[in-house]
Amino acid sequence: MKYWLLFLCLFAAVSSWSENTYYRFRVYLKDKGNQTCNTDHPEAFLSEAAILRREQQQIHVSYSDLPISSSYKEQLANCGCALITESRWLSTVVVEYPDSSLVEKLKQLAFVDSVCWVWKGKHIPLQEPDHTETLHIDKKALRNRYGYAQKQIRMMKGDKLHKQGFRGEGMRIAVIDAGFTDVNRIDAFASTHIEGTRNIVYPGKTVYASDAHGTKVLSCLAANLPGIMTGTAPEATYWLIKSEDSNGESPIEQDYWAAAVEYADSVGAYIISSSLGYFDFDEPATDYTHEDLTGRKAFISQAAQMAAEKGILVFTSAGNEGNTRWEKITVPADTPDILTVGAVTEKQKRSDFSSIGPTADGRIKPDVAAMGTNCCVIEPGGFIRQANGTSFSTPILAGLGACLWQALPQLNAAEIRALIRQYASQAKQPDNELGYGVPNMYKSYKAGLKDGSKRRR
C-alpha cells in the first residue's frame, strides 16, 4: 500500500510539472501593421523626456520608434497565447503557451516573419519581502570623502571632476541588472534620488528582492556616506530596472534586456549602466560562438545599438571570461557604438578575468577599462565588501560618464563617448585587452571645455 501511494504521489508530481511547463517564443514581425501614429506627432507614443533627449541631440524620431499595431497583438492573443514582452525597435513580440506546437500556428499569420524558442519553464511564485527597518552600515569612517571607494574613483581622476561641482545632478541613469535587494533599506542609499523602478521579468513585483548583484552595482554609482563610501554619481537621478531572471540562463533574457533599454528610453534616461552579459545558455543549442560577436547577430546587441542611436550613452561590462575557455567579451559587449568596460587592478594592469577582444569583425573591444579588482561595494544587509568583476568597473565609469556629460551638456552621447576614449591611458596604442586604456575623466572634461569654446567662437 505504501509503494502504491508513493507511486501516486510521484505521478501527481510529474503531472503537475507537465501541466505547469510553459514555452515562450520570440515572434519576428514583417512590419508594425497599420499605424494610427506617425513620426510627425511623437507625443502620441513617446514620453516628453524621450523626445527632449532626441531633440537636444538632433536625432529624428523614426519608424523604429513607432509602436507595434494593437491589431497584430490581438491576433497573436487570439491564438491562445499570452503576450509577455515586446520590442518596438526590433519589431518582435514574445508570447507564452503551454504547448510547443504553437509555433506552426503562429507562422501561418500573414504578418509573422519567423518564430524562435526563447524559454521553457514553469511559473514560480514570488514571496514579497516585508522588512521595513533601516540597515545601517557598521564601518569606521575614513578621513576622506570617498571612504573605502577612494582608489576606484581617483584612478580615473573622478575626484577632480567632482571638485568642479559635477556629481551627476540633473543626469538620469538607468541601471539594468538582476535585482537590488535591500537598496530601499540601506542607509547609504537614503539620499539617492531613485525616480522609479521596473521589473521586466516579473511585472508588478518589487526589484528590491531576489538578487544582490544590482545592489553592489548601484553602490558604485549612488552610495552616499562620506568617509565610508561615496559613489561616482551620488547626485544623479536613478531608474532601477530588473531584466535578469536569476532562475536560469535562457535567450529570453535578451528580450527582457531589450524591453529594459526601451523603457529606459521612455523615461528619458541619458545613461544606461548594464553589468549583464551572455554567451552560453541552459540549452547549448542556443549558445553563441566567437563568430557571432559582430555586434549585429545577437538580439541583445541589436537592442544596445538602437539605444545608442537614440542618443543614450550605454556602458556595458566586457565580461569575466578572460581566464576561461571562452576568453572573449560577451554580448552585448560587441556592440559598436557603446562603451564596453574591462577591468584593471589597482596598478592598472588587466585583471586576469577581464574578457578580451577583438570582435569577430576585427573591432577593438573592450573600449576602456576601470578598476575591477578589489572594488569597494555595498552588499545586502549593509555590509561593505571588496568584490571583483567588470560588473563593478562598468558602473564606476558610468557614473563619471554622467558627471562628464553634466559638465559638457552641449555635447551629444557620441561625443562624450569619444572624449572618454580619446584621453584614456593608451589611446595612442589601443589593444584588445584594455582598449584605449583607463580613462582620465578630468582631461576629458578640460578637452571638452576647450573644444566648446572653439565652437562658440
Locations of regions flagged by a protein language model:
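N-terminal domain-start motif of subtilase-like serine proteases
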Residues: 83-87, 102-103, 127-175, 198-210, ...
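Substrate-binding/access-modulating region of protease and related hydrolase catalytic domains
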Residues: 162, 224-227, 240-334, 360-363, ...
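Inhibitory N-terminal propeptides of secreted protease zymogens
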Residues: 19-133
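Gly/Ser-rich catalytic serine loop of serine hydrolases
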Residues: 169, 204-215, 295-296, 385-398
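Bacterial Sec-dependent N-terminal signal peptides
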Residues: 1-22
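Catalytic-core environment of secreted peptidases
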Residues: 184-197, 343-391, 428
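Hydrolase catalytic cores
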Residues: 218-221, 241-245, 368, 372-434, ...
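Subtilisin-like serine protease catalytic core
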Residues: 22, 114, 149, 159-198, ...
